[in-house]
Amino acid sequence: MLRINVCFDASKKVPAKIQQALRAEIEKEILSNYERGVVSVGKGSSAEVSISGVDDDEKKVIMQKLEDIWQSDSWLP
């Protein structure tokens, strides 16, 4: 099962609506291609992205899609 975890640095104070919008966009653009998957977006002690449950080649593809989502502003509320 695919798992995507996105953590924002808690000191950056990213609004909850931004986190929710990012989660929804990841679910729409990435999870829709997988039978099972989980996306978690929240705050942590540092900014990080982790992907598990897929092989290394698939991780690279997913990471590129995540970068494309992040660089696009169409998902921002």
Swiss-Prot record:
One biological process term in Gene Ontology: SOS response
Classification via InterPro entries: DinI-like_sf, DNA_damage-inducible_DinI-like
Keyword set, alphabetical order: DNA damage, DNA repair, Plasmid
Coiled-coil region(s): none
SUPFAM superfamilies according to UniProt: DNA damage-inducible protein DinI
Superkingdom of source: Bacteria
Alphabetized Gene3D superfamilies for the sequence: DinI-like (3.30.910.10)
Range of residues in the leader sequence: none
Protein family according to the UniProt entry: Belongs to the DinI family.
PANTHER family, per database record: DNA DAMAGE-INDUCIBLE PROTEIN I, DNA DAMAGE-INDUCIBLE PROTEIN I-RELATED
Protein name, per record: Protein ImpC
Record organism: Salmonella typhimurium
